[in-house]
Amino acid sequence: MKIMILGSGAREYSIALALRRVDKNLEFYFAPGNGATESLGTNLNLKDPVVLATYAKEKGFDLCIVGSESFLAEGVVDIFKQQGLAIFGPSKAAAMLETSKSFMKSFLKKYRIKTAKFLNTNDIEKAKNFIYSLTPPIVVKADGLCAGKGVIIAKTHEEAIEETAKMLSGESFGDAGKLVVIEEFLDGYELSIFAVCDGNDFVLLPAAQDHKKLLDNDQGPNTGGMGAYAPSSLANESLLRKVQKDIILPTLAGMKKEGAEFCGVLFIGAMIVGNKPYVLEFNVRFGDPECEVLMPLIEDPLELILAATQRRLRHSKIKIKKEFAVGVVCASENYPYKSSPKSEITVNNIPENSHISYAGVSLEDGKLMADGGRVLVCVGTGKSIEEAQKNAYKLCDNVNFKGKQYRKDIAHQVLK
């Protein structure tokens, strides 16, 4: 079976690793991939969705899995389907749940799904009036995709107005910020909840928790994510039932009414306030680093993806292992401020019940080099969260490159 995976991070690497676990004969092609994905398959220097679809058809690919949201925003799923190709991910219209925050918020309001009080606007005067109606802190979001960096939490009314003006002028995020979403701040705890959907039905995956801040104890600047763990004991059965009834089902029904059936991964960034789930954001693909801790917990991820793509989730028996996973991101020394010089990665040995998912790496003269940002993720699994964490950090100690930085407290929320 020939499978194309679109993206270049640890998320895409972890998907291939998980699929290889259930079928050693799979052939992988990554577009564009990274220096480590070459050890799992073939990297393709292709990015244009039309070119990718043509190539996939010519080479007789059986399945394409979209890892990165940028491909979804370009309508890669629609293009592949027009060619009669099997692809896992939502259409361009359905992907607007992530690619346009204003669309997402209006959708939530229309279908009465709990979310923070908000205003979508491109008018600074309307923005000011709404900002002064809120009690700080105040959340200001750029409408479009900003590589996970388009959200500001302002401590004062004045800061919120200043950040809104910078977005609307194009100074902060270019065209992505020329429409903004201003929100009340919700005070609770965040969970990442994933549902794999086929338009009508869904399979709920274990709830994960991401760690956005660079430093221990949730200090320092925001990042793309410094680690994750799953399942989270903070997501009790009662809460997950509410998420299914009050968020996932009305979202699938609503998207169908909008003429954009949702097939793929619905990633709910949820804020839990008094055991009630509110939608902070939707993403329409696996999170990174959450994907790296979810993949080891799915008994047969290939069957899950195929069942969703073929719209037969209702009849598919997807099993989740009774295990835990912890993923610790090792980042380059200057992350997230600026790029760092390349340096060779050495791995002394990989202990049992652990593995590495590679992201910001390149291959030079047969050597794997740390090449920017989040370099790799050390993943540990175990029968308890304590065991999984121990295995992840044992692996971390065996991985070295110049300036390696990582958090020492991943999963602290449930290990206090």
Curated annotation (Swiss-Prot):
Gene3D superfamilies attached to this UniProt entry: 3.40.50.20, ATP-grasp fold, A domain (3.30.1490.20), ATP-grasp fold, B domain (3.30.470.20), Phosphoribosylglycinamide synthetase, C-terminal domain (3.90.600.10)
Domain annotation ATP-grasp: ranges: 105-310
An individual GO BP term: purine nucleobase biosynthetic process
Keywords recorded for this protein, A-Z: ATP-binding, Ligase, Magnesium, Manganese, Metal-binding, Nucleotide-binding, Purine biosynthesis
Top-level enzyme category: ligase
InterPro entries assigned: ATP-grasp, ATP_grasp_subdomain_1, PreATP-grasp_dom_sf, PRibGlycinamid_synth_ATP-grasp, PRibGlycinamide_synth, PRibGlycinamide_synth_C-dom, PRibGlycinamide_synth_C_sf, PRibGlycinamide_synth_CS
Molecular function as annotated in GO: ATP binding; metal ion binding; phosphoribosylamine-glycine ligase activity
Cofactor(s) annotated in UniProt: Mg(2+); Mn(2+)
Enzyme Commission numbers on file: 6.3.4.13
Pfam families in UniProt: GARS_A (PF01071), GARS_C (PF02843), GARS_N (PF02844)
Binding-site positions, Mg(2+): E281, N283
Origin superkingdom: Bacteria
Recorded family membership: Belongs to the GARS family.
Name this polypeptide is given: Phosphoribosylamine--glycine ligase
